[in-house]
Amino acid sequence: MNLLYLGLLLFVTLLTTLYLASSKAIFAFSDWTFHAARVEEIYLNLKSGSFFTFIAARTFHNTGAASFLFYPYIFFYPWAFLRFILSPVNAFYAWYALVTFATATISYFSMKAYSKKSLASFIFSLVYTFAPYRLYLGGAVFGEYLAVIFLPLLFLGIYEVLWGDKKKWYLLAISGALVAYAHILSVFLSLEFAVILFIIKLITSRGISKDRIKSLLLSAGVCVFLVLPVIVPFFTDFIGQGLSSAKPSISYTMGPRYLLLNSFSAQKGWKLSFMLMLTILTAWAFIKSRRNWIIYGLGLFACFLTTRYFPWKLTAGTPFEMVQLTARYLSYASLFLTILLALGSSSVLEEHVTGRKKLALSCSLAVFMALFSLSSLSVYRDTLKHVQDMPKTSANSTQPAPFKRLRDYNYYNQFNYKILFGAFDYMPKSSLTSVQKQNSLLMHQAYLNGKTLTLSPLIKANQISYQVKSEKAADVDLPVIAYKHTTVSVNGQKHAFRRGNRGTVVVGLKRGQNTVTVGYKASPVFYLSIVISILSWLALLIYLVKFKAKYAQ
């Protein structure tokens, strides 16, 4: 049955993706320009022969912003590689299909390992993968979108360590690492629920065995080794460097009425599906086991966290403000409530359906979910029909990127606009103290001998060069951010520099024409972390092969 169900999941994936791709356009809203610029930088660096990307030399207005150092991007490589064989729009939708099918497949096998039921796993995968909130994330919010792929595997790992087979600790290590490589904030959100589950374990089991504690610590330790390349830059380049990050604040919460009523509408967005809302209203009537009551409680609590009735004001000044948008908890609400929906509905169906009827039912469920998803995506398609194309603007424009339509012929127009959300993330705080400073970076303005110069950058991978002519020896303040491992050369010779009041590179020049090149050279510790991480993944793979062989005996 696995092949049948995976085939049906692939069918729904392709149908929904082709429905979007047939528009031959993309709606650039929310975080789209931030992530699209990162993918463009990776693609252009790959094209020039550089595999690693550290700073934004070609995008982000050539400011050298280091969002690549502090925001994981490994899962964007498939999108970047697809750019070599497909047009920009088609490359995105091909990547979108890959992510969707990966979500469906991991969801299916995670639920199969938990429930041991194929039909329940199929229903879970369908409802979870094509949930309205996940469809919304797939339009632009790609950090969360990628993290959602691995949440079912992550909570399967937590279950195995705390209640199931503790020898499967590796599931938690692997899934935790994959979430970290997708979206750091999702690691924090997942830890919240992991702590709740740990407390529930202590209460319901009146403690926890030493073996389970060992498995928990082992999975955490291995996970750290697996994600060292994500962790190390924070220690080598972020801590103590006066850099900014995404602004911590709770900027939006929903009312219960909004969540309830909005969930019964067809379109994608910040909501649950009507199926999950019905699960909330009816699940209590058929839940029998303590385990399912716990899952139900977690689903309700996740919904509660999205609303303004949770005392979010009390979190001011705490790490919990990193959540920013409480709608992020909808991914967790969808996960827990979909487990109940899948278990309950599959039990009822399997009592009355066998043989060929089961095949017909499975196909019908796939068609229903495909139609439901197409209905959810129809508003997006309608938007693409009526919104205007993104117009051209100057290369150093300070105008925020508008919510407009992108096609292959105007795809590159977006990179000349100021990125709407995240343009100044991970820059020195000193560069953000005024709009004038921010705009001076976007407009490539340098300061020399009391004069303002507008310079044109010469770009290579992780490297920005400027031609600067000075009438006398003087310091030049370039529109490129200075980090701990920034490198500077003048006329081909390594040169000392300091950080200016904009957080930018300031370097002393001799009289005459000078070529100043600003680059980034990662710490040797970073490359060591990559080696350790790769060896850890290989060691874990060898362990799994031996473990499976021993387990099979």
Name each model-derived stretch.
Residues 8-9, 208-232, 294-301, 367:
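Hydrophobic alpha-helical membrane-interfacial segments at the cytosolic entry of transmembrane helices
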Residues 429-553:
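Active-site-proximal, structured, solvent-exposed surfaces of multi-pass membrane proteins
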Residues 154-168:
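Membrane-interface transmembrane helices that cradle and orient dolichyl/undecaprenyl
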Residues 1-18, 540-553:
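Start-transfer (signal-anchor) and selected internal transmembrane alpha helices
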Residues 225, 272-296, 300-301:
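Hydrophobic, aromatic-rich transmembrane alpha-helices
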Residues 15-114, 119-152:
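Active-site lumenal/periplasmic loops and adjacent helix-entry segments of GT-C-fold
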Residues 190-220:
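Perimembrane helix-loop-helix junctions
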Residues 157, 169-184, 219-225:
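Membrane-interface alpha helices of multi-pass inner-membrane proteins
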